[in-house]
Amino acid sequence: MSVDMTAPEWMHAQITAAEYESWSEEQCAGIENVDGMVVVSPGASKRHNRLARILANALDAAGGADWNADTDFDVRLQDVPLTNRRPDVVVYRADSIDISPTRPEHVLLAAEIVSPGSETTDRVVKLDQYAGSGIPIYWRVELTPAGIPVVNVYLLDSASRRYRDSEVFTGLVKATVPFPVEIDLPGPW
C-alpha cells in the first residue's frame, strides 16, 4: 500500500484573504499566512500550551472587563499580501470579541513562547511584524537551559514602529504593562 505524499495545491501558491476566509476552521488550524503563503506550524507541546494558558489566564484576570486574553487565533496583520499570525497569547479589546478578523488595532499585547524551530521567527521576524503593524506590547518567553521561563517585555515606539526593551522577568513576572500583573512561572518546564 502506498501513501500519496503530494502536498495540496494551496501550499504552493499565494492565497488571498477571501480564499482564506472561505476555509473551514480545521483547514486554518496550525497554519499562519505570510505574504499570502501558507506556513505550517508544528503542533505545540503540552508544556508550551500549558505555559500559554497560564499566561493567558493571568492576563485575562488582570485585564478586567475591558480586555480579554486568549490563545490560538489569527491576528490579521495585513490583507494584501495576506499575513495572519497566531500569537501564543493575545490580549485584545473585549468589545472586539465578535469581530473577525482580529486586527492589530484590537490588540494590546501579543506573546510568543519560543520553541525549538521558531527561534528566529519569534525573536526577529514576529518582533518586526508586530511592531510594524502597531501592536503596542510584545512579550517573548524563552526557557533557560534549566527550564526556567524568562519573559522579555517590549514596548512599541509609535514614531519608529519599532519595539524597545522594557522589562525582563525570570520565573516570577511582576509586569506593569499592559497592566499590573503578577504571574508565577516556576520551572523547570
Where are these regions (language model features)?
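Gly/Pro/Ser/Thr-rich low-complexity, intrinsically disordered segments predominantly at protein N-termini
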Residues: 1-189
